[in-house]
């Protein structure tokens, strides 16, 4: 069975809520009250993508299963920097999150992200989006 932190993905539906940065504890608590199972941190959409800032934002979700996503513009996201910088960020945050989402078409980083996640026994959501 796959786990996102302590949350077992047992085949029952789960609710993932996307977040950008700048959330206060009350908004996170409200999402939990409304049934959120997983917080998807859309790091590509953060106003500040500095690693230290991202790690501080992750800390706000302590005790909540976290799926980290960093999509490039070609993947429908907002990451403005290089794939090398994106890979470095994934590697820096992997120990602090419960799972990562990487686009299948991210050929320059996908295998590296998957390998880094596997080394830490973290699940990977390997996404595919067709924008044609």
Predicted regions located by residue number:
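Short, acidic/polar
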Residues: 19-33, 81-92
